[in-house]
């Protein structure tokens, strides 16, 4: 039954991801958000191996051992009567392509930048993906209580490299050991950092008159007044329409570890981040207000529960609503199924649900039939688009210490590839198994998970591959000639799509120039 309060439920939801370079403080921010949402009583802190205390959002064994986030956790919490769906992406140096795909399931992104380092490599790559859909971006410049770069310099870098117009919402009062707080330009309030006074904020009147000297000292008071006058004259005021179009980004400053500025972020998500947005299908636009249910799979996680060796499919609801026991059509395989055991998440903990709405992420038990990119509807034959596979950047040849376990190896690799950990390629000329990943750490993850979850010992050999491009060709004669001339460089991926594995960029350029009627693509639609 379709709820009469559907529109109200939509307005109460925000679905967003946090993205950053390693060590920018993303996990700490996630923990503090859960703390503000009263999901956890004490925020966890990342500790070294063997400490026994880990962040709530890091729940896989390898994450706990290394103190890093490898998978993408999905967490739901309530803040000021708004239901927040937070997709926490990996913050370690090597992402999987799963990280990129997560951004297709959110309506807004929070970018975390280290105040001492500015924009770093992984932030750039994630932003490139977010910009494909013009996803609204909120920026948090973290670690102001440590030595940091000049704030204006960081804003200039954001505008130049990320092509976003910066709109400062808060502004730091000094930094490092002298960090005293921020002036909230939009609310016209000064928030003091670890104030020794009874009040932890000052009104605008206090900012303008001489009483500010009591809190900051005469010299700092004069300096911050002059700096703020400059900032408010140089930068534009916040415009929600431009933010929602991905043109501008509101800028916040603070210290996640010091629990300072996180509430400002959450308040901005409530006020400015969009409620669930529409999605494009192969036939039409699907709006969240529609009565009929639709959703798509953006992630699969194998063996979340080692006791049950299960696989979970993560579904973003696009329209309609989920009700326990409803019948859905799995469009790709043209099969109707009854969903009675969907659940929501809290960093690995499953909570059975009776209802869910657009913007929510629900988990479905998967026995091998659900794949990334699959669409579920109430009968309409559509497929959501814009959920791609990305060409890997690093490659390895995998082989077994015990050749008799080849069958188990293939099964394990299929599961790991379906959840986006790595991609698996089968050369057309031999039985080798070549793995491709976005970052080197994913290979360590595969070896460890094969050992723990499948009792398989495998090792790697280096392979002479530097680039991969999927082949798209409508001319059978041209495709035949390509296979004949370059068979040693061709392979099939897990979906049996043909891919060219190039030993160098020069090699790829030559092949492309000689086969102008064939497309060599860095992404492939699921």
Swiss-Prot record:
Keyword Cytoplasm included in the entry's annotation: yes
Pfam families: EF-G_D2 (PF22042), GTP_EFTU (PF00009), RF3_C (PF16658)
Domain tr-type G: 11-277
Binding site for GTP: 20-27, 88-92, 142-145
Single GO molecular function: guanosine tetraphosphate binding
GO cellular component: a single term: cytosol
Domain of life, per lineage: Bacteria
Biological process according to GO: regulation of translational termination
Location, primary (coarse class): cytoplasm
Keywords: Cytoplasm, GTP-binding, Nucleotide-binding, Protein biosynthesis
Places the protein is found: Cytoplasm
Function: Increases the formation of ribosomal termination complexes and stimulates activities of RF-1 and RF-2. It binds guanine nucleotides and has strong preference for UGA stop codons. It may interact directly with the ribosome. The stimulation of RF-1 and RF-2 is significantly reduced by GTP and GDP, but not by GMP.
NCBIfam families tied to this protein: prfC, PRK00741.1, small_GTP
Family: Belongs to the TRAFAC class translation factor GTPase superfamily. Classic translation factor GTPase family. PrfC subfamily.
Protein name: Peptide chain release factor 3
Organism whose genome encodes this protein: Buchnera aphidicola subsp. Acyrthosiphon pisum (strain Tuc7)
Taxonomic path: Bacteria, Pseudomonadati, Pseudomonadota, Gammaproteobacteria, Enterobacterales
Gene: prfC
